[in-house]
Structure formats: C-alpha cells, structure tokens
Regions:
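A short alpha-helical cap/connector motif
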Residues: 1-95, 99-123, 128-265
Length: 265
C-alpha cells in the first residue's frame, strides 16, 4: 500500500500526535489514495484508535476490508461534511492530505472545528500550496491567509480588541502552530476563554506602563526620574510627563513604525 509523505513531516507528526498514542481516539484522514497511510496510522496510534479515511475516488472503499471506515465525497462540499459528522460524531484528530486547494483546506478546517473534541487537533498539511501558482496562488484568500485571519480570531478574546463579527471560532480554537508546510490547530473550548486582568496593588506614583516607551528617550527619562522627581507629586505635571515621554503618542508611534519596518524586508 503506497503512501506519499515528505520526510520532514514525520518529526512534526511526532511532536503533534505522540500524546494520542495508545488511546481511544477517532482519527480522520482526508485523501487516503491507496491506503498506505491508514495502515501507518493504525500501527502508530494502536488498536484502540478508530481510523477513518475520506477520498473522492470510490475505489478507496476497498480499504474497508482491512478494518478502516471509508467515506467517499468532496472535502470542499459543506453538505458532505454535515452528513459525515452526523454519522460518525465528534473526532479527536483530522489530518488533511487532500487536494490542497484553498477552498478544500478552508472548508475542511472550518467544518471540523465544531466537530472536534476538546484537546483534539486539526492538521492541514502541504500548506506550501498557498504559495504555488498551480493552486491559484498567491491569493488574498489562500489557506495561509485564512490561518493568519484565525490568529486575529484567537486574539479577539482579549477584552480591549474589537470582536470579529460573526465569528464563532474564538471560543473553540485554543492555539495554532505553524511548521514548514503544516498548520496544526488545537481545539479546547474550556481554555479558549476571554481574558480577565489580574492586578496587584500599583504604586500611585509609578505605573508599569511608564516603562513601555522609556527606551525611546532614555536620557530625558532618566533626568526626569532623578533630577525632577519632586515634580511627580503634582498630578498635572505627572500627567503631562507621562503623555510626552511614557505614552504611545504620535512621536513614539512614528519611532516604533520606522524601527519595526526594517524587520519586514
């Protein structure tokens, strides 16, 4: 039984999947070809694992005689996924090695998120397709750009960030890990909660935010903190000093922008 995998993938698999070995899990692979990888995964995860394959080609049903569950359908078809999950229930791992197209990968991930158990993992491989012309890329709507969008979704759990409208993934996706040609999404609704600030007693004369921009004006900041320390007792002076030298005002933002820009070349 033939299986095609890039050699660097196996070290990534081990890092992501090792915690599931020997456990009762439901593992789904999209794109099983001749079935070689299904045998590999059964040997790797152990006999307790429920191994399910998805493929477009009806010939893949032949693999059922080896004890695998095989479903035939298109991974870019939302109705296929709804029918699939209604039959098998929630899963623990999904590995997408299907067609590698943007829509195929995006639909597969999006439909799997709410159908994956807590502490489960969704892995999309061959994500280098997002950079290749034969897959219609580069594109604003590539899978990698969708993955970056999901980073914004995760960070929208922070209370000061405007919530991304109509997105119901922020309370499901706990983390996203990027590897060479592989993206791994961890699902955990219990840990995907909005942040709450835990605050200890803060000195009225000195705020932790005062340290955020002092590196831009070290000499001035040091002079104010030593020579003009007495002025800090005056609320109005303290407010002015903080705005000019310790806050993200216009001057500081420009300096941040220019310094950061050079790292994006």
């Amino acid at each position: 039984h033939v299986s095609l995998k890039y050699d660097t993938y196996f070290q990534t698999y081990e890092e992501i999947f090792s915690k599931y070995v020997g456990k009762e899990i439901t593992f789904v692979e999209v794109g099983v070809l001749h079935g070689g990888s299904l045998f590999m995964w059964r040997e790797y995860f152990g006999e307790k694992a429920r191994i399910i394959g998805i493929d477009l080609h009806p010939a893949a049903k032949e693999l059922e005689k080896h004890g695998f569950e095989i479903y035939i359908g298109s991974q870019s078809d939302i109705n296929f996924w709804k029918n699939f999950f209604s039959k098998i229930g929630k899963i623990d791992i999904l590995l997408d090695d299907g067609g590698h197209g943007n829509v195929q990968q995006i639909v597969t991930l999006s439909e799997a998120i709410h159908n994956t158990n807590d502490d489960g993992t969704i892995v999309i491989e061959d994500t280098h397709a997002s950079y290749l012309k034969k897959f219609g890329n580069p594109s604003k709507y590539s899978f990698m750009n969708y993955s970056k969008y999901l980073i914004d979704v995760i960070n929208s759990r922070f209370s000061d960030i405007k919530v991304i409208e109509n997105n119901n993934f922020k309370n499901k996706i706990y983390s996203i890990s990027f590897y060479e040609s592989i993206v791994a999404i961890k699902i955990n609704s219990k840990k995907s909660i909005e942040t709450t600030l835990l605050k200890n007693n803060e000195n009225e004369m000195f705020k932790v935010t005062d340290l955020r921009t002092t590196d831009h004006f070290p000499k001035i900041s040091n002079y104010i903190d030593t020579k003009l320390k007495a002025l800090h007792k005056l609320p109005i002076i303290r407010k002015i000093v903080r705005y000019l030298f310790y806050s993200h005002n216009f001057i500081v933002k420009i300096k941040h922008y220019l310094k950061s820009k050079k790292y994006f070349k």
